[in-house]
Amino acid sequence: MSFLSIFTFFSVLISVATTVRFDLTNVTCKGLHGPHCGTYVMEVVGQNGTFLGQSTFVGADVLTESAGDAWARYLGQETRFLPKLTTIASNETKNFSPLIFTTNINTCNPQSIGDAMVPFANTVTGEIEYNSWADTADNASFITGLANQLFNSTDYGVQVASCYPNFASVILSTPAVNIFGKDDTLPDYCTAIQLKAVCPPEAGFD
């Protein structure tokens, strides 16, 4: 794969950027501690069966190495082997899994996003990322309390958005998810959405 192809592929990922609002007040999941405690998935309002989650894809560096090296990296569970793109998609989308949000059992406050990796936002694109190597990059910064920001975006002065500025939707068939300031004007190729918390079993997830 040529350098130009690799550069084009990753520029597509970066250039892709739906405003998010969260409300836990009307959610009651059976068998959980309290009416608003436990684990939730976030469904897009008005788009039945579309959730906030992650899509995985094979990185360009993997495509340029031998099958033996790639297999060894896979068996070693190297996170960089399958980078994750935070996105919105349906339950039936291939290589997609919803993000599971967990609340504190004592306070019911959002405390974590179900991935074991620490999420952060790219300070250039604002994109939420989980890739293991990118958190050391110059253009990346950790977000303190990201789960709380996502659950209560208006209270924390942020907008969460997804956009299709070019042919990225054709290649990946999905937008990326980005964080913007509350007063930022979103690009005209962005579409505002709302998310609501739903119980995983009710959403079709075990």
UniProtKB/Swiss-Prot annotation:
Primary site of residence: cytoplasm
Signal peptide bounds: 1-19
Annotated compartments: Cytoplasm, Cytosol
GO cellular component: cell periphery; cytosol; endoplasmic reticulum
Keyword vocabulary terms for this entry: Cytoplasm, Glycoprotein, Signal, Zinc
Induction field: In zinc-depleted conditions and has increased expression in NAP1 deletion mutants.
Name used for this protein in its record: Protein VEL1
Native source species: Saccharomyces cerevisiae (strain ATCC 204508 / S288c) (Baker's yeast)
